[in-house]
C-alpha cells in the first residue's frame, strides 16, 4: 500500500469490514506489540512488523496505521516510518526492530524508542509528526556516555515503554524468562528531557517469576512487554506475565515504584474467563502477548495481538473494549471478533479469519516455541502471495470455529465457503456445546464452494460457532448470513 491509503475491506465483504473487526488491520498485515495513542483526532498504533510465513520475530521495518477516533473500523496506512538500516549499531543489518514505543517530548516532537534484536541497549529516533519519517537521534546513555544496558551491573534492555511528564521521561524495560535468575524484573529508568540521558539509574518496579514470592505477583509475574499509561489518576503498568498469553496490569501513585498487581486485562485465549466454558479451557492458540490500553472518546480499549499460521512469528493486532468497574478496576476483556464495542451486523458475508475462537478435541494453550503446530490443529493462514486471501486451514473433525458477536434479526439461512478433501457437516450453534441451530453439508471440493442450510436462531445478540464433524481436512474462507 502507499502512504495515506485507507483500508476498508476486500471488495466482496467491504461493507461488513467497515465495522470494527479483529484483527483491526487488513488480513495480510502483521503488526504485533501494538502501542496505541490518540494524537489529535486520530488513533495511531506503533508496533513491530512480522510477516506471513516468517520464521523469526519482527523482520520488517516499522510501519504505522491510524484511524479516526470516531471510526475504529477504517484504518489508514501511514507508510514506513523507520528502517532498521538507520541505526548506526545495525550497519550489518543483523538486528531486527523489536517492539517500540512512542512518547511526545517537551519540545512537542515524537520520540520512537526501540531495541534491536541483537543488542541490549535502547535506541531513539525522532520526528516532528506522529507518522512521518523518523530520523535516528541516539542511544540512551549515562552522563559519562556509557550506554544504558552496558554499564557494570546493568541488566539488558528490552521492550521499551515510555512516559514523558514535564522535565522527566520514564523508561520501562525488561525481559525475565523462567529459570534465569540474572533477570530480576521490570525496570524504570528516569531520563532527562533530551530523551537520551539517564537522570536516575534503573530501579525494579515489578518482579520476574524467579523473585515474585511474597510480592502479590505470584503466578502473574513480569515476563516482558512493559507499557505505562495514566489511568484513573494513577500510573498503570501493563505487561506480559510469565504465562505469556495474558496482559496484566498494576497500579501505583508513583511512576518509579509501589506498583500493586491488580489483575488480567486480556488473555489471548480467554483463560481465566467462564464465558460459557471452564475457566481453564483455551479458546484460541497462543504464545506471547504485548500491547497496552488507551482511552478513545471516553471509552477504554486494550490492544493486544494474536498468533496465526500455527507459529510464533505471524502475529496480528486485535483490540477489545474494556469494562471499568465502579471502583476503577479493569475487568478481564473477552476476546471477540467485533472488538466488543458493539455487535456486528447480522447479515451479509464475513471472512472466516475474523474468528476469535478456534479449538479442537485436543486442548492446547501454546503455539510451540521455535516450531509449528502439528496437523491436529486448525490455523488462520493466507494464500502464499502478496496480500493473499486469508482463511482457516486444516479444520478436522471436532474442530470448532467461533465468532462473537452478531446482532441477529430475522436470520433464515447461513452459507459457508469451504474447500478441501473433506466430507461431513458444520453444526451451527450459539454457544459452546449448545443445541444445534442447523447443519450445513460439507463436500469434497478442489475449489472454493458454497454450502447452505436453514438455521433456527432467535433475534438478539449471539455468538456463532461452526463445529465440523466428518473426515478429511477442511479450509474455511467465509460465511454469509441470509435474512
Annotate the PLM regions.
Residues 1-439, 443-483:
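Carbohydrate-active catalytic/glycan-binding domains of CAZyme proteins
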Amino acid at each position: 500500500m502507499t502512504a495515506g491509503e485507507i483500508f476498508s475491506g476486500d471488495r466482496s465483504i467491504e461493507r461488513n469490514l467497515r465495522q470494527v473487526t479483529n484483527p483491526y488491520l487488513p488480513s495480510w498485515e502483521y503488526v504485533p506489540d501494538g502501542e496505541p495513542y490518540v494524537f489529535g483526532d486520530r488513533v495511531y498504533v506503533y508496533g513491530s512488523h512480522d510477516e506471513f510465513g516468517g520464521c523469526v520475530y519482527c523482520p520488517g521495518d516499522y510501519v504505522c496505521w491510524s484511524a479516526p477516533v470516531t471510526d475504529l473500523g477504517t484504518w489508514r496506512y501511514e507508510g514506513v516510518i523507520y528502517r532498521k538500516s538507520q541505526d548506526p549499531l545495525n550497519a550489518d543489518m543483523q538486528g531486527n526492530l523489536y517492539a517500540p514505543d512512542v512518547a511526545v517530548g517537551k519540545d512537542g516532537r515524537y520520540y520512537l524508542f526501540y531495541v534491536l534484536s541483537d543488542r541490549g541497549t535502547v535506541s531513539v529516533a525522532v520526528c516532528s509528526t506522529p507518522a512521518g519519517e523518523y530520523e535516528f537521534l541516539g542511544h540512551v546513555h549515562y552522563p559519562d556516555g556509557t550506554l544504558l544496558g552496558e554499564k557494570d551491573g546493568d541488566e539488558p534492555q528490552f521492550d521499551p515503554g515510555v512516559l514523558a511528564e514535564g522535565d522527566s521521561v520514564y523508561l520501562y524495560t525488561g525481559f525475565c524468562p523462567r529459570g534465569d535468575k540474572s533477570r530480576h524484573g521490570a525496570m524504570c529508568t528516569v531520563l532527562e528531557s533530551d530523551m537520551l540521558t539517564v537522570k536516575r539509574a534503573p530501579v525494579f518496579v515489578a518482579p520476574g517469576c524467579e523473585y515474585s514470592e511474597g510480592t502479590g505477583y505470584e503466578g502473574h509475574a513480569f515476563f516482558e512487554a512493559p507499557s505505562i499509561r495514566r489511568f484513573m489518576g494513577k500510573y498503570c503498568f501493563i505487561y506480559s506475565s510469565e504465562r505469556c498469553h495474558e496482559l496484566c496490569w498494576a497500579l501505583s501513585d508513583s511512576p518509579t515504584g509501589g506498583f500493586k498487581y491488580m489483575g488480567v486485562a486480556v488473555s489471548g485465549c480467554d483463560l481465566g474467563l467462564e464465558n460459557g466454558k471452564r475457566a481453564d479451557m483455551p479458546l484460541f492458540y497462543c504464545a506471547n502477548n504485548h500491547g497496552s490500553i488507551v482511552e478513545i472518546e471516553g471509552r477504554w480499549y486494550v490492544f493486544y495481538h494474536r498468533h496465526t499460521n500455527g507459529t510464533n512469528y505471524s502475529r496480528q493486532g486485535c483490540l477489545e473494549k474494556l469494562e471499568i468497574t465502579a471502583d476503577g478496576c479493569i475487568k478481564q476483556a473477552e476476546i471477540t471478533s467485533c472488538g466488543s464495542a458493539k455487535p456486528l451486523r447480522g447479515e451479509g458475508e464475513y471472512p472466516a479469519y475474523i474468528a476469535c475462537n478456534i479449538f479442537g478435541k485436543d486442548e492446547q494453550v501454546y503455539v510451540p516455541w521455535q516450531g509449528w503446530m502439528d496437523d491436529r490443529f486448525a490455523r488462520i493462514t493466507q494464500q502464499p502471495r502478496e496480500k493473499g486471501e486469508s482463511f482457516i486451514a486444516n479444520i478436522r473433525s471436532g474442530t470448532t470455529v467461533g465468532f462473537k458477536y452478531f446482532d441477529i434479526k430475522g436470520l433464515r439461512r447461513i452459507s459457508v465457503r469451504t474447500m478441501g478433501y473433506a466430507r461431513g457437516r458444520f453444526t451451527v450453534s450459539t454457544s459452546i456445546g449448545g443445541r444445534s441451530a442447523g447443519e450445513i453439508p460439507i463436500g469434497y471440493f478442489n475449489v472454493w464452494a458454497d454450502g447452505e442450510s436453514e438455521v433456527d436462531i432467535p433475534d438478539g445478540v449471539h455468538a456463532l460457532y461452526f463445529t465440523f464433524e466428518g473426515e478429511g481436512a477442511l479450509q474455511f474462507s467465509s460465511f454469509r448470513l441470509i435474512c
